[in-house]
């Protein structure tokens, strides 16, 4: 075989090996950069979560500050924060006349969910402190459930409004979730319906898993 041809072939093999080595190094560099980005993002999220936890006032702080009481549907509350002086007459409401709006403080945690209930009027939930709260909004006719997160996380909304006639329940954050509620028209016991576990299971068996989460015992 010609010496020049042998030398060219040898040079080609060397270039091929070097190219392969450079390609491998490039792939490893890309992987290292991706891993570094993941580590930095995870670290930043952990740092943010830790800062948020440190900023929490605490479950007992709010209970004591506002002298909150046990609520029939679960959690703690303090009613009478604000009630409008204006009164309205509405079709479909017993005795028709209601306050224009009213507000209260409410607090839940994962061990003390808010049982499924229904209001004739609308109710808006405003997040104040703690970890995100999960809300289950169920259509009374079809049983279809929409899940929403109340809080300040990327997937959350700090304000969630529930339309009157919706059956809904909630599970507070791992530590607690402190919120305020605004009811329109103003809250009245005659407009409130609380559901029992068996009643819901019989009517909406397709929602058994969520119902049993709200009613653990």
For the regions a language model picked out, list residue spans one by one.
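Ligand-binding loop in jelly-roll beta-barrel domains
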Residues: 164-190
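Intrinsically disordered cytoplasmic terminal tails of membrane proteins
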Residues: 1-16
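Non-catalytic, conserved peripheral segments adjacent to functional cores
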Residues: 52-159, 176, 185-188, 192, ...
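Low-complexity, intrinsically disordered regions enriched in charged/polar residues
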Residues: 9-12, 31, 53-57
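Alpha-helical transmembrane segments in eukaryotic/viral proteins
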Residues: 16-25, 31-47
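Intrinsic low-complexity/disordered segments
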Residues: 5, 48-51
